């Protein structure tokens, strides 16, 4: 292998040879057996952190945390999931989230705001940004929507997402529970979402255990989401903006989430019309995105009186 799986993953930034090595280890042994263009891995241990979606141009790959999760998702009926509405959250106001010295803990993410505004235009949905993107409001709205997209800071160690502090709080200084969306918070919500997109730094890397990646992505699945799109390592905000624009354009064209992911990665890898795109052909920019859970297909704007999205479900054999 030329190193342990962990060593290969740590070097992934940055070396096409590492991606080829992962292909040789994970996909090459079964390549001749594949008779489909859609493949699901149930990874364990450090293999949870492999960028499966980037391993092949001919096969669309997604993952599932465990066989138990696969059974639950496969057994869920279409009627359970919401058919409309989207929750778009981007660039929460974080200037009140400070250290004891008064210095802000986090920088604002202007590209995240542009990201959800772009998606909002496509879905005819007003995004939550700035002071409106509070933890309380996000928890309130996420219960009934079909699509959740959060573009914000995330933490790889605890699976937490940083939102704007709740305005109703007992102390002048924002406490962690006022702005951190934790795994416990998500577990407590009964979701009806078909797809959750976490456009957040480190949003895919929780603590690795035998049941799968334990992080905010798994929390959303356990709370009822059918599929989650996450990034496995820190992501450049401009590259993410371009990636998401391509991803949602393909979703709007009624392509499945896995196929939209495939096209968006290819777009970022190959786009060379403008000089600013050239650096994004590096693996570290286009390869971190992975689809966890089921595959879904959206239909945008079928009924003009319905705000948000309408869903179609992929036919299964």
Which residues does each PLM region occupy?
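Catalytic cores of enzymes
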Residues: 1-317
